[in-house]
């Protein structure tokens, strides 16, 4: 009888641990999402700062301890799902200056990391996770 209850408890704990990371990811503050960012733009005739909407955040990544041909590694990168170019004029530009055309994110998604246009390096283990919010420390 005792062994049966112990076995059942082990199964419940294992099931809980299996589901926990999936549920934690859906409420993570560091997940892939739209984010406002201020950048500096310049050219010969003018320069200044603008605020754009871009994608930022962490994506789930699978990195196995062993190499396998039937279990591929996948590394997601937070990137634009839908975007468009917006015309931006800077205050410091002379009258009649050509505008800047800036890509602006409309929605974001975790997609397979494309090394031709994305930095796919791993993030340091010192990076805050969903469990620890640096603002609450």
From Swiss-Prot:
State the Gene Ontology terms under molecular function.
hormone activity
Q: Name one GO cellular component term.
A: extracellular space
Return one Gene Ontology term, BP aspect.
Answer: G protein-coupled receptor signaling pathway
Which positions carry the signal peptide feature in this UniProt record?
A: 1-24
Q: Enumerate the InterPro entries for this protein.
A: Cystine-knot_cytokine (IPR029034), Glyco_hormone_CN (IPR006208), Gonadotropin_bsu (IPR001545), Gonadotropin_bsu_CS (IPR018245)
SUPFAM superfamilies associated with the record: Cystine-knot cytokines
The UniProt keywords, alphabetically, are: Disulfide bond, Glycoprotein, Hormone, Secreted, Signal
**Glycosylation sites (chain numbering):** 36
The primary site where this protein sits is: secreted
Q: Where are the transmembrane segments?
A: none
| Keyword flag Disulfide bond | yes
The record lists its disulfide bonds as 32-78, 46-93, 55-108, 59-110, 113-120
Taxonomic superkingdom: Eukaryota
Quote the subcellular location field of this record: Secreted
Pfam families attached here? Cys_knot
Summarizing the function annotation, the protein's role is: Involved in gametogenesis and steroidogenesis.
Family affiliation: Belongs to the glycoprotein hormones subunit beta family.
Provide the assembly information.
Heterodimer of an alpha and a beta chain.
> Which named protein is this?
Gonadotropin subunit beta-1
The gene name on file is cgba
């Amino acid at each position: 009888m005792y062994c049966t209850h112990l076995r059942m408890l082990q199964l419940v704990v294992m099931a809980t641990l299996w589901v926990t990371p999936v549920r934690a990811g859906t409420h993570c503050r560091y997940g892939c999402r739209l984010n406002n960012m201020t950048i500096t733009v310049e050219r010969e005739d003018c320069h200044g700062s603008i605020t754009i909407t871009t994608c930022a955040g962490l994506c789930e990544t699978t990195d196995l301890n062993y190499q396998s041909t039937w279990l591929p590694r996948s590394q997601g990168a937070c990137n634009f799902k839908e975007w468009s170019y917006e015309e931006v004029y800077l205050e410091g530009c002379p009258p009649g200056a050509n505008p800047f055309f800036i890509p602006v994110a409309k929605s974001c998604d975790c997609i397979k990391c494309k090394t031709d246009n994305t930095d796919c390096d791993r993030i340091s283990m010192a990076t805050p996770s969903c469990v620890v919010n640096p603002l609450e420390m």
